[in-house]
Every structure is written in structure tokens, then in C-alpha cells.
Amino acid sequence: MTAVVACGHPDSAADDVSRCASPDSSKYTSELRKSDLPWSGGRSPYNAEAKLDDGRRVAMYYLRNKGLVEQHYSPRAKAWTEANLIHRTEADACQGIELRAKHGTVAAIADFGPYCNDGEPPAESIAAVGVDSLTEWDINVTKDFDGWERASVSDDGSEVVFKRNTTLRWSRADGFDDQ
């Protein structure tokens, strides 16, 4: 398992678990991008979007040979931020992306694996949490795990619980639990 904090810089994924500054330094000058993975039929599971209580939106999507990408939207600016790579991997996207938002906290679930297109389970299960300005994301990578089934954000946004047959907890005070 690896804990990573991405601090709003394109392609950032340092092995530093220290907190970054939280003020919103985002520049809202872009349009929303979408996953470059092909999908036929209805809505692509490789794109996800959630609305926050204050009208902002956050979107995540997979990019082939890059990883998990995030953008957020300001209703005041009527624009999106530049794409921010929050987890780099060249493995295939598995399953879809799930986003939950409550009281300024956004929780995300995403999975990757080298043979997911062939039906194999994920090799990397991502639990991610962004708060307030969404310029920083706490990332937890669980290796060789079937993927988180759901994420629940507490009513006040201070805690997130990721569940499958085990539980991973995140809090504003302490970040992710040590496992």
C-alpha cells in the first residue's frame, strides 16, 4: 500500500505524505475533458462527475497510459480547471469510477490492472479524497485487491469510509488510517 498526496500540479504524485497548502489556487480556464478509452453503448463508466453543495462540480476520468485524472468546475467562472493527474499508471482501467461528495469533501474509487480488459481483477485499487479547494488529494493505493465497493462521506464531510470485505477510513484530522 502506498499513500500519496497530489498537490494540484500536473503529473504530481510525490511519495510525500505531508500536507500541501489548501487555499484554492486553481485557474478555471478549461473545458471538461473526457476519458480517451473507447466505450460503446450508454454512459461511459470511465467518466464520473459529482456536484458539491456549493454548486461546484468535480470530474474524474481515465486516460490511457496515464492514469486517473481530475478536474473541478467553478460556477462563478463557468469553467473547469486544467486536467490534474492524481494517480499515474500504465495499467488498464478496471470497472468504473465512483464519486461521492458531501459538505466540501469528495471521495473517489478507481481501479487499475494489467489484464482488466481480459476480465482479470484490479491490481491497484484507488481510494482518493479531496477537500475544500480540491487542489490536494489524499490517495491510498491497495495492491492486488478486488476494489472498493462503496465510499460513504459523513454528513459533515469530516470522515470517509471505503468498504468491501474490509474497511479503510479517512479523516480530515489524520488522513488515511494506517493498515
What are these regions (language model features)?
Residues 62-67, 113-118, 166-170:
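Short glycine/acidic-enriched loop and turn motifs that connect beta-strands
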Residues 70-75, 121-134:
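Beta-propeller blade signature
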Residues 81-113:
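Blade-loop segments of beta-propeller domains
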Residues 53-59, 103-109, 155-162:
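Entry beta-strands of beta-propeller and related beta-repeat scaffolds
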Residues 36-51, 90-100, 141-155:
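Repeated scaffold domains used in trafficking and secretory/extracellular systems
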Residues 1-11:
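Secretory targeting and sorting signals
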Residues 42, 134-179:
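Acidic, small-residue rich beta-repeat scaffolds with periodic aromatic anchors
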Residues 11-89:
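Extracytoplasmic low-complexity, Pro/Thr/Ser/Ala/Gly-rich segments
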